[in-house]
A protein has these predicted regions:
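C-terminal beta-strand-loop-alpha-helix "lid" module of Rossmann-like NAD(P)-dependent dehydrogenases
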Residues: 1-179
Length: 179
C-alpha cells in the first residue's frame, strides 16, 4: 500500500552505495568481466562513494584500480556458489544498509541469455520502489503480481521478512548466472 513507511522502501540518507559485483576469477574471452566493470565505472556512480562487495578477482582488481573501496572480497565463492554463500553475502550487505553505512544496494552481474549472448546487468536491490516493480512486471510479465492481496500480518513485518529473502534470491540468481 502507498502508506507503508519502511527503511527498505525509503533508502538511507547516506550517499554511499553498496554494489555487489560478480565477475570471474580468470580472464575470459570477450568482454565478460570488462562489461560488468564498465556498468559501474561509466555509469552514474561517484566511484569514491561506492562500497564494493566483490565476487570474482577480475572485477575486484579493476574496480580497486579505478579507486573504489573494496568492502568485502568473496572471490572464493564464484566458482561453485551456494545459497548459503548468497545468504551470508546478503546478510552482510543488509546489515550495512540497516546501520546506515550505505543508502542503496546494487547488484552487477552478467546474465546468461544463451551460449553466445551474455548481457551485463545492473539492478538496484534496495530501496525497493514501485517503479522498479512496475519495470520488472513490464519486462517479465505480471504473473499475477498486480492482484490485490490481503495479508493477516502487518505490512511492515511482511516487508521485514520478504525483502531480505528477495534480495538473497537475486544475489543467488546472479551468482548462478555468472558462474
Amino acid at each position: 500500500s502507498a502508506g507503508i513507511s519502511h527503511p527498505y522502501l525509503q533508502g538511507g540518507d547516506n550517499p554511499r552505495k553498496a554494489v555487489i559485483v560478480m565477475t570471474s576469477n580468470r580472464g575470459l574471452a570477450g568482454g565478460y568481466n570488462a562489461n560488468v566493470v564498465k556498468l559501474i565505472t561509466q555509469g552514474n556512480f561517484d566511484l569514491k562513494e561506492l562500497d564494493i562487495y566483490a565476487v570474482g578477482k577480475k572485477g575486484k582488481d579493476a574496480l580497486q584500480r579505478a579507486g573504489c573501496k573494496i568492502s568485502l572480497d568473496c572471490s572464493d565463492i564464484c566458482e561453485e556458489p551456494t545459497y548459503a554463500d548468497a545468504a551470508a553475502l546478503g546478510r552482510r550487505v543488509l546489515t550495512s544498509f540497516a546501520q546506515g553505512e550505505v543508502g542503496e544496494i546494487w547488484l552487477a552481474y552478467t546474465s546468461f541469455i544463451n551460449t553466445v549472448v551474455h548481457e551485463p546487468r545492473l539492478i538496484r536491490l534496495l530501496p525497493v520502489s514501485k517503479e522498479d516493480v512496475d519495470e520488472k512486471v513490464e519486462r517479465e510479465g505480471s504473473a499475477g503480481l498486480k492482484l490485490q492481496m490481503n495479508f493477516e500480518a502487518e505490512e511492515e513485518s511482511i516487508l521485514e521478512m520478504l525483502i531480505p529473502k528477495y534480495m538473497i534470491s537475486m544475489i543467488y540468481g546472479g551468482l548462478l548466472e555468472a558462474a
